[in-house]
Amino acid sequence: MPKTRPNWNWHYAGKIFAVGLPLSFASIVFSLIYMAISPIINSFGPSAIAALGIGHRIESINYTLCSGLSMACITMIAHNLGAGCFARAKATAVKALSWCFYINIFFVASFWLIPDVYASFFTSDPEVQANAIKYFKIIAFSEFFYGAGTILDGIFAGGSRTLPPTLVNVICFALRWPLCLWAVSHLNLGLSSIWLTFTVTTLVGGLINFAMFFMDWWHKPLNQMEENAA
């Protein structure tokens, strides 16, 4: 049989890379920043790293729930925008964010009210429990923006605009390293200064992403979408 070469559509390949590369780059940066922050946390002893691990395990439940909504947003928003149904696409985004709000009411309340219950699930070490309890109580103030940020990533991806939120997320996340160094040496709060840095950067990034959403930066201009649909 004759051999044939694949016929690449470079136009669509470019669109795929434009949507996917920012997200891939962000994942790499997040890993590198955590590698840089880990020695700072470890300077407070093994119990500090253990407490962070407990916090991340519980937060992963919130992340998993919001990731499901985020993936649904990507499909439904892209479908509706492609069909020229902008109002339906925006309604989908707003509905997903409202569900995220209800989900995170539970996590914010439980992180603040019963952090000791979460900590006791994983360890009986009193020092690790104390550090984990501080983590949950401090991070609770930004938990809604943590979940909403996951939803907003999906909303922007559905609108083929992954670059704006990725830039915000990468910059805010990268700032954690110098801010952790500064907070540890100037705030005299010990390990809590690192947890506070995590909270502040999540809050700032979430507020900026929300502002971009309400400014309709999550999709291409309507006239451009109409041309693509035509």
Spans of features found by a protein language model:
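Short alpha-helical transmembrane segments in multi-pass integral membrane proteins
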Residues: M1-L21, I77-S142, V184-A230
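Transmembrane alpha-helical segments of integral membrane proteins
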Residues: L175-V184
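Helix-terminus/linker motif at the lipid-water interface of multi-pass membrane proteins
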Residues: I28-I61, H79-N80, V117-P126, H186-L187
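Membrane-helix interface segments
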Residues: S47-A48, T162-L163, G190-L191
